[in-house]
């Protein structure tokens, strides 16, 4: 999907296993920045690498032109296709925050620490991180065009966003949750601070999230405000539940009860979702 003369969005379609032989359909976006060479922000999942490469060819570029891959965070739907990028363009460099680097370079470790049933359907393997990114770093992806690194933890400990001032383009990964979505983060307070930080970035014309089609204009602030309200709503739900449930209530039971309050009924909760609700309980302890 062409957004501007230099920015394209690519939607990856994949399935997430929520129980044995039970899947939900998911999507995630990568972003293609076109300059003298190609910069790819996030690589999607393992199974969609051929489609991403076909798209590059359709717009007149070669997968071998990818020279820079900033990674917003280390979750499977963002790193699963990295080995395919490396095979197509062996000289490509991969950039990530130090806190998420271990899960990119050791995917077996990520699977142990954050298990997903079909993890290895989504993730092909590890790649080496060429450079660790931190707040204020800049990456030049084309002549006269840069990406400035903004540390936006919460969704993961090493989540980053990237701002291209010359294009007014803010690439936020999963830093801003969708209104009504099941929460996926490790620290709700950090997520709130990160969204508030992004709201203050001057000159943003386009918001490029991992979960939603590109957003422009007044919708940007609305989307961020909706994300803040979603976290605050969940925090209040967990706070109220903690007043009535026994202290020894399991994370599974707490999550099921909280999801019911959100209008979502389930008998099984993914570990990443339990982590989200338990992070609220820890905050309110």
Language model features with spans:
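Core dinuclear metal-dependent hydrolase active-site scaffold
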Residues: 32, 135-164, 169
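Conserved beta-strand hairpin/beta-sheet module of binuclear metal-dependent hydrolase folds
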Residues: 2-59, 161-174
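Active-site environment of divalent metal-dependent phosphoester hydrolases
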Residues: 46-48, 74-79, 101-103, 157-159, ...
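Active-site HxH/HxHxD metal-binding segment of metal-dependent hydrolases
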Residues: 45-50, 57-139
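Active-site neighborhood of phospho(di)ester-bond hydrolases with catalytic His/Asp-centered motifs
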Residues: 41-44, 66-74, 94-98, 151-154, ...
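C-terminal regulatory/interaction regions
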Residues: 237-285
């Amino acid at each position: 999907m062409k957004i501007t003369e230099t920015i394209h969005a690519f939607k990856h379609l994949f399935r997430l296993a929520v129980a044995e032989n039970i899947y939900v359909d998911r999507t995630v976006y990568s972003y293609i920045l076109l300059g003298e060479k190609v910069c790819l922000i996030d690589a999607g999942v393992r199974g969609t690498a051929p489609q991403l490469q076909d798209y590059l060819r359709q717009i007149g570029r070669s997968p071998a032109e990818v020279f820079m891959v900033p990674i917003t965070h280390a979750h499977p739907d963002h790193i699963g296709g990295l080995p395919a990028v490396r095979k197509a363009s062996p000289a490509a460099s991969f950039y990530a925050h130090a806190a998420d680097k271990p899960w990119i370079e050791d995917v077996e470790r990520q699977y142990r620490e954050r298990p997903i049933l079909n993890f290895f359907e989504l993730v092909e393997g590890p790649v080496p991180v060429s450079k660790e990114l931190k707040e204020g770093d800049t990456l030049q992806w084309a002549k006269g065009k840069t990406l400035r690194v903004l540390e936006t933890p919460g969704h993961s400990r090493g989540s980053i966003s990237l701002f291209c001032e010359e294009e007014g383009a803010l690439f936020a990964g999963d830093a801003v949750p969708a209104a009504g979505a099941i929460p996926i983060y490790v620290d709700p307070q950090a997520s709130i601070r990160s969204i508030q930080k992004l709201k203050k970035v001057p000159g943003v014309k386009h918001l490029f999230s991992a979960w939603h089609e590109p957003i422009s204009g007044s919708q940007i602030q609305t989307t961020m405000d909706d994300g803040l309200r979603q976290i605050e709503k969940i925090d209040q739900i967990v706070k109220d539940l903690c007043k009535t449930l026994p202290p020894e209530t399991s994370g599974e039971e707490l999550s099921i009860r909280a999801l019911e309050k959100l209008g979502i009924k389930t008998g099984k909760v993914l570990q990443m979702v339990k982590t989200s609700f338990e992070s609220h309980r820890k905050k309110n302890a």
